[in-house]
Amino acid sequence: MLNYFNYFTEIEDRFQQRRGALLLLSTLDWALIETWREAGIPLDAALRGIDAAFDRYEARQKKARMRKVNGLAWCAQAVMEAAEELREAAGKHA
């Protein structure tokens, strides 16, 4: 079982890694992570969602100039989609 601290730091590390620059998370970002944790979003879903959001961003960035991603909220929809996919996959295997 992942402890409270690791859930936050793993998400922070992945976001910083995918962004390509050190960016301290804001208090709103930390609150979003807390919301995910309280909602039972698995760490794997959060990390997959961050990766998916940045994959889409990078694909679009090749076509048009886009602003830098400055906050974790930009990944929120992809995290929720990844969590739903994990739930559906778990339901099929149950």
PLM regions and their residue ranges:
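Intrinsically disordered, low-complexity, basic-enriched segments
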Residues: M1-A94
